[in-house]
């Protein structure tokens, strides 16, 4: 059976943490910042963690990623 390939689009969007979790960027950060408060923009800059319900599915796509 051939090796599982890493889903390249997902590999560019997620980073693994030391404890085995995954970091991701926030949505809504591309444009139209005039409609968002300063506080909202500040919080959107920080990375977020992938939720536990999505973790198993995403890790399967990133099977070869270290």
Swiss-Prot record:
Coiled coil: none annotated. Residues 1-50 are annotated as: Disordered. GO terms for biological process: translation. GO terms for cellular component: cytosolic large ribosomal subunit. Keywords: Ribonucleoprotein, Ribosomal protein. InterPro entries: Ribosomal_bL35, Ribosomal_bL35-like, Ribosomal_bL35_CS, Ribosomal_bL35_sf. Residues 1-46 have a biased composition (Basic residues). PROSITE patterns: RIBOSOMAL_L35. The keyword Transferase does not apply. GO terms for molecular function: structural constituent of ribosome. SUPFAM superfamilies: L35p-like (SSF143034). Belongs to the bacterial ribosomal protein bL35 family. This is Large ribosomal subunit protein bL35. It comes from Lactobacillus delbrueckii subsp. bulgaricus (strain ATCC 11842 / DSM 20081 / BCRC 10696 / JCM 1002 / NBRC 13953 / NCIMB 11778 / NCTC 12712 / WDCM 00102 / Lb 14).
């Amino acid at each position: 059976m051939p090796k599982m390939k890493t889903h390249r689009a997902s590999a560019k969007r997620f980073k693994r943490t030391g404890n085995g979790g995954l970091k991701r960027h926030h949505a809504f950060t591309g444009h139209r910042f005039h409609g968002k408060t300063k506080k909202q923009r500040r919080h959107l800059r920080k990375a977020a963690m992938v939720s536990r319900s999505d973790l198993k599915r995403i890790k399967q796509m990133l099977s070869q990623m270290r």
